[in-house]
Structure formats: structure tokens, C-alpha cells
Amino acid sequence: MAVSLWQQCIGRLQDELSAQQFSMWIRPLQAEMDGETLVLYAPNRFVLDWVRDKYLNTINQFFTEQMGSDAPKLRFDIGSRPASKPAAPAASTKSPVAPAAKSPSKPSFNSNEPAATANHRSNMNPTYQFDNFVEGKSNQLGKAAALQVSENPGGAYNPLFLYGGTGLGKTHLLHAVGNGIIKNNPNAKVVYMHSERFVQDMVKALQNNAIEEFKRYYRSVDALFIDDIQFFANKDRSQEEFFHTFNALLEGNHQVILTSDRYPKEIDGVEDRLKSRFGWGLTVAIEPPELETRVAILMRKAQESGINLPDEVAFFIAKRLRSNVRELEGALNRVIANANFTGRPITIDFVREALRDLLALQEKLVTIDNIQKTVAEYYKIKMADMLSKRRSRSVARPRQMAMALSKELTNQSLPEIGDAFGGRDHTTVLHACRKIAQLREESHDIKEDYANLIRTLSS
């Protein structure tokens, strides 16, 4: 009875949550009765803690509404019940799911598979591991999903689609997943490549009349990771071959991970049937790192290089370079090289001198005025509305977005930002920043708008 009601509870959660939230947190759960207690199994500690913190009250409320005082007790555990089935229903009204043949409970990596698997030499970069991936709010979900895939390839998150701007850590996560899979099963055939390599291989196969060998190779892998899938755009034959390869891999419970610089539905020149399949599993945004994460990245990189980086220097760099991890690491490498060549200590003045061209470019590009104009154009409102007292949502929300971006992308104080928005109080700016942060958690559209504007302003 309780397990049956759990399926109904899943239906309610699916209606209330976004497709990404449902796929990320609810779909992987498995339910089993233990006496009078309903046990919900989560695949890892991260999912368990998140569900218990965010959704426990909703779940308890549903059971109380349905069963009153007879509602079962709830307990959370890590793992899976024997011969389990996924907690979520086989079909979803919010987003399509993979064919029924794809069962997350069946491992697709078998050490007894053909010799071709065992003889395959992995092209995973061993330096990219989960341990040296700096986690923050901007990439927390992406790392959690990638970690789950490495522990249970071919499971609930298949395919996994990671999207975000250049240099944010998508490739790092791909290699970390591959290294994790191979660590658990050295015989696994895991292939990583850029999308252009797939196209090149297919062209060579056509030229050499070896298209059947091409198909056999790509459909025999245990996991296929393709970076920058957007480069398939307008390559019709490549899309056709990848479509059939994708279907074959998922039907065989083999893991697929794809990355792109944009949300799947926004990739122009890619067939709708492929975009639809990209959303079968889980789609996660990797956003530019927030200040605390940028500082942590710099401190970790300096530590790995054997350099003592003062906290105030790390904050100085992190506050001024915001677009991506690659830019941060490149700037730090330049600082370290200059310090080694000159023998000078790394201070704020030294960093200001070593990075003067880079810092000057950043300060020139991102101003509050530039942010206001960009946001106004994005939301199709008048620039004057940014400074007006109008409170309609069509104006207030873009204004709040511009305030939040001003705090994130400039070095101006809250009072200075308020002055630039028609003389508003600093508490108004603080409220706007908190409101946008909340909406980014709750609304996919706001999250997308924020990421798109960050990319535009940082490019």
C-alpha cells in the first residue's frame, strides 16, 4: 500500500518540480517497505541529504493527506534494494525518457565482455579527477550527477548532458567520470572525444568504404563521452550516424555523456529528434564560478604549484576575473611565472602590475552602464526603465537582474550600485541579489537568462 502511494507521491512531485529537479533528485530514489517503515534508497550521500532537506516535508505531507494517522514512517538509506526498479514511473509527462529496455538497475559494464574491451586503451586524462575538481554552487549539481554516473554508469542519468560556457570544468568532469568508471572496472571501454573527431572518423570511414567498421566500433563502447556537441550543427550525415549510435548505446544500457556551450534546445542546426534524445536523461547547467569558488580554485592551484598565495591576493584576482576557470588559472600561472623570474613576493601591487593588461581589459568591458544596456536589450525594455520607479514585473525583474549582475561582475559597492539605478538604497540592491539567487534555484528560465547574460557580458 505504502509503496503504491509512493508512486502517487512521485506523480505529485513531478507536477510540482522542474524536469531537471525531478530527474536529479526524485527519479533515482527506490522504495521498499521494512515492517511499518517506508525506506527510500538514494544512490549517494549527496542525493540523500538534498532530498531529506528539500523534499521531506512535502513527502510527509502527502502521506498524511492520503493515510492520516496510518501514514508510514519514512527512513532514508544509501544504496538500492535487491532486484529494484527505478522509483520514477516509466513515462514522464514533463520530459521524454529513454526506451523501456534501458533499466538503470542492470550494470552495463561486464568484465567478461569481448577481448576488444579489455584491449582498449583509454584516452582519459588521469590528471582530471573528482578530488581535484573545486566544487561550488555553480557546479554542485554537475559534479553530483557526474559522480553518480561514475558509480552507476548506464543508470538513471543516461544520457547526462552538461552545458555551459568555455572553461567552466565540463571537460574535467567528463574525464573524472571516465577515470572513475575505469577504476571500478579496468576492462570498461570508455571513449572520450571532441565532436569534430567523430565527424572526421565518419568521413574517413566513408572515404575508405569502412562505414560498417565505424558503426561497430562506436556501438561497442561501454561509455561514450562527446565534448562540444554543438559542432554537429548542419552536419546532416554525422547527425544521422550519431542518432543511430546514440540509440544503440542507450538500448544496451551503455553510458552517454554530452557537453555543449548552450542548452540542448538552443543548439541551432541540430535535428529535433536528437535534441529530444539529449533530454532523455539529465540536463545540468555548469555556470561561471561565484567569488568563493574562484578564490578556492586559485588557492588549490597555488597549492598544487607549491606557492603560498596570500588570501588577500586570491580575493583581489577573483574579484576582477570572473568569466571562467581557465582564465583564472591562466592569470595565476602568469603571476607565478613573473614571481619566479623576478624573485619578488606575490602582493596585490605585484599582481596589479603582472596582470595590468588583463585587469584593464576587464574593467573596460564590464561597467554598470554596460550591464544596464545589455539587460535592457535582452528583456526588450527601455534603458530609462532601469532608473524608473515602475514596479511591474516586466520592468522590476530585469532591473533586479541587472543589479545582481552588477554586484557579481563589477567591484562597485551596494550603495554605488543603488546610486546607478536611480538613487536606490543599498538594501534594495541586496534584496534584488537575494531574489535573483532564489529564482535561479527555482526557475529554469531565470537560470538560463542569468547564464546567457553572464556569457554576453564576459565575452
Swiss-Prot record:
Composition-biased stretches, type Low complexity, lie in: 80-108
**What is the recorded function of this protein according to its Swiss-Prot or TrEMBL entry?**
Plays an essential role in the initiation and regulation of chromosomal replication. ATP-DnaA binds to the origin of replication (oriC) to initiate formation of the DNA replication initiation complex once per cell cycle. Binds the DnaA box (a 9 base pair repeat at the origin) and separates the double-stranded (ds)DNA. Forms a right-handed helical filament on oriC DNA; dsDNA binds to the exterior of the filament while single-stranded (ss)DNA is stabiized in the filament's interior.
| Region annotated Disordered, chain positions | 75-124
Give the InterPro entries listed for this entry: AAA+_ATPase, Chromosome_initiator_DnaA, Chromosome_initiator_DnaA-like, Chromosome_initiator_DnaA_CS, DnaA_C, DnaA_dom, DnaA_N_dom, DnaA_N_sf
> Where is the segment annotated Domain I, interacts with DnaA modulators?
1-90
Region (Domain III, AAA+ region) location: 123-339
What family is it from? Belongs to the DnaA family.
Q: What stretch or stretches form a coiled coil here?
A: none
Compositional bias ranges of the Polar residues kind: 109-124
Gene3D superfamilies on file = 1.10.1750.10, 1.10.8.60, 3.30.300.180, P-loop containing nucleotide triphosphate hydrolases
Keywords from the named record: ATP-binding, Cytoplasm, DNA replication, DNA-binding, Lipid-binding, Nucleotide-binding
Q: Where is it localised? A: Cytoplasm
The biological process GO terms on file are: DNA replication initiation; regulation of DNA replication
Q: A Gene Ontology CC term for this entry? A: cytoplasm
Its encoding gene is what?
dnaA
**Amino-acid positions noted as binding ATP in the UniProt annotation, renumbered to this chain:** 167, 169-171
Segments of this protein annotated with the region Domain IV, binds dsDNA: 340-459
> What's noted about domains in the record?
Domain I is involved in oligomerization and binding regulators, domain II is flexibile and of varying length in different bacteria, domain III forms the AAA+ region, while domain IV binds dsDNA.
* Cystines in this chain: none
Instruction: Give TM regions.
Output: none
Query: GO molecular function: any one?
Result: lipid binding
What's the name of the protein? Chromosomal replication initiator protein DnaA
